């Protein structure tokens, strides 16, 4: 299974915003594109990460469990890029 780093970022931002429109705006993508990427991630992991309703978005227990791991991956990736720029 290969999960691109940008999808991990999408997950983290949506988990922070809990709103597809605001998260998509922060990520400079469209809400439908964000929704599609999150759905693909859920399919890859075979778990539901967000409960979606017309009025709100909430993390599921799986989403809450994944969030610290995803943030760590994102931070490690950022450090790797920073190190690469400094050498």
Which sequence ranges carry the predicted segments?
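Short, structured secondary-structure boundary patches
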Residues: 38, 54-56, 71-74
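Short, conserved clusters of charged catalytic residues that mark active-site
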Residues: 6, 58, 79
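Alpha-helical linker/hinge and terminal dimerization helices associated
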Residues: 44-45, 66-87
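A short LG(V/I)-centered, amphipathic sequence patch enriched
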Residues: 42-59
